[in-house]
Amino acid sequence: MEQIEFLILKNLIHNEKYLRKSIPFIKSEYFEDSHQKMVYEEIFSFVEKYNELPTKEVLSIEVEKRDDINEDSFKSVTHLISCLDESPVENEWLVDTTEKWCRDRAIYLALLDSIMMKEVLTNTMVF
């Protein structure tokens, strides 16, 4: 089974209708995998600047320009980009699934932040 994150990335570079509808709601922090997060950041940056779908070649070039990536990560990210082939997916299903994924990730991250804040407060209180 394909991960939703990978399916999202594939469609962000191949499906303009999907991109326009979903990119305003997807945040880079929703991606758990650092390589997927980098690819999303490059997609978002390109779309924000040029208002067009980026190609795999453009993404690879942009990743190469980053100074926050080591050689092993670069190889992994460029391999990930090379695997982002177009595959037909029913658009409405994909949008619904992406919306659910965004909600789930936002809730998870909010809960995680709350737990961390509670731990910090508990550990810094003086009795």
Positions of PLM-derived features:
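Noncatalytic partner-interaction/assembly domains of nucleic-acid and motor enzyme complexes
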Residues: 1-101
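Interdomain "pre-motor" coupling segment immediately N-terminal to P-loop NTPase/helicase cores
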Residues: 82-127
